[in-house]
């Protein structure tokens, strides 16, 4: 009897287990070993406080606080070798007035020592005049030439600001370099920006150069306007390059710029020289000098922009090399006199007309009173005639 009851219980238990399998889906069950999640080191350990034992370590720690934009920092002092109070005062002065990044970024810094030189702490307080983002955006370059390349790219991109840390710094007129680059590359840069430039510190082998650029138009608008300028410059290049000799190419360029456009004389110096000349018909000596330079370079003619005065007023013109001889060319003079053909001018002729410029900075021109004039350029073909443009104002 007992044996029969045991058998019945065993059967019931077996059925119960198999019944469970009808509603518990084995494919939804998984067993994985438990892994203890480690806590990141940054959550278990506080950032280690800098420890200083001598002047060099103290200086490095203070400069590190500045570079990391730390407004309030703690330094631990242990068995300090030297006069920590005197060193601290000198280092703070250096960090805020002589160190390039400190001179650029810090308005004021102070520190307080508690304890002793054997076991103490220094609390450093820094007031920044630059944001952490501004410090982080500083670009380090090896010398002035590398700095100028960065500046040129910023101008091409129409950037509004650039901060450079220049090693092996040499005294340079960066504002003049910027202006020259803009004038020499009207195909890349539409406007000569207003420039704000500051150097930090005032003296030193390594300096911070902070530049800000202000433009007359938005970046998108300037790109559209530059496209219009390049359309006309490309047409001029195609026309000028039909000339076979230096003389012919120079004469064709003169004819393109003086005969194919209707100009009004502009009194104010333009901030967008090529656009004002080619797209709006505003004639200024700066505009002519810039466009002539760019077109001469494109046509393989040696050319320079000359800055000086005429009748005591600022004036710009060009120096061209024609078949190995140098001559001055002033297209503004041609427009004012309604001259359709190119006139090659010597230094003597310019001085007779009250031009003044640093003559020794440029190659000498022939001493002959009547320099050879270029021949009449060959009339353009029908293909080059199609490049004609009007300089009437655009909408």
Regions found by a protein language model. Name each.
Residues 276-286:
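Periplasmic OmpA-like peptidoglycan-binding domain that tethers envelope proteins to the cell wall
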Residues 19-243, 355-395:
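N-terminal accessory/pre-domain segments preceding catalytic cores
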Residues 2-24:
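Sec-dependent N-terminal signal peptides of Gram-positive bacterial secreted proteins and lipoproteins
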Residues 287-352:
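Hydrophobic/aromatic-rich core segments of domains that either
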Residues 217-278:
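Secondary-structure boundary elements
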């Amino acid at each position: 009897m007992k044996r029969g009851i045991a058998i019945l219980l065993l059967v019931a238990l077996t059925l119960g287990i198999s019944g469970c399998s009808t509603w518990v889906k084995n494919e939804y069950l998984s067993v994985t070993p438990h892994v203890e999640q480690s806590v990141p080191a940054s959550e278990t350990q506080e950032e280690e406080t800098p420890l200083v034992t001598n002047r060099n370590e103290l200086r490095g720690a203070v400069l590190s606080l500045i570079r990391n934009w730390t407004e309030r920092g703690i330094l631990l002092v242990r068995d300090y070798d030297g006069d920590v109070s005197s060193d601290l005062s000198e280092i703070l002065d250096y960090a805020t007035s002589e160190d390039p990044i400190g001179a650029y970024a810090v308005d004021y810094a102070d520190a307080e020592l508690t304890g002793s030189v054997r076991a103490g702490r220094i609390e450093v307080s820094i007031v920044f005049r630059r944001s952490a983002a501004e410090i982080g955006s500083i670009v380090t370059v090896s010398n002035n030439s590398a700095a100028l390349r960065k500046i040129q790219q910023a101008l091409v991109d129409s950037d509004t600001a650039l901060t450079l840390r220049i090693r092996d710094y040499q005294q340079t007129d960066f504002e003049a370099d910027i202006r020259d680059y803009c004038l020499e590359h009207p195909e890349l840069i539409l406007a000569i920006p207003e420039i704000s430039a500051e150097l930090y510190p005032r003296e030193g082998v390594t300096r911070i150069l902070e530049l800000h650029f202000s433009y007359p138009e938005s970046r998108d608008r300037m790109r559209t306007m530059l496209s219009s300028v390049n359309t006309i410059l490309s047409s001029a290049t195609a026309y000028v390059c039909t000339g076979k000799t230096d003389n012919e190419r120079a004469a064709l360029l003169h004819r393109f710029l003086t005969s194919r456009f209707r100009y009004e004389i502009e009194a104010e110096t333009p901030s967008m020289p090529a656009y004002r000349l080619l797209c709006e018909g505003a004639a200024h000596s700066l505009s002519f000098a810039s466009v002539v330079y760019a077109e001469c370079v494109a046509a393989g003619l040696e050319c320079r922009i000359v800055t000086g005065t005429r009748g005591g007023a600022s004036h710009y013109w060009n120096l061209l090399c024609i078949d190995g001889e140098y001559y001055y060319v002033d297209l503004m003079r041609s427009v004012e006199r309604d001259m359709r053909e190119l006139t090659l001018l010597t230094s003597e002729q310019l001085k007779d007309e009250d031009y003044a410029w640093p003559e020794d900075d440029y190659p000498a021109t022939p001493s002959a009173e009547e320099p050879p004039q270029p021949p009449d350029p060959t009339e353009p073909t029908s293909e080059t005639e199609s490049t004609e443009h009007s300089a009437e104002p655009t909408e």
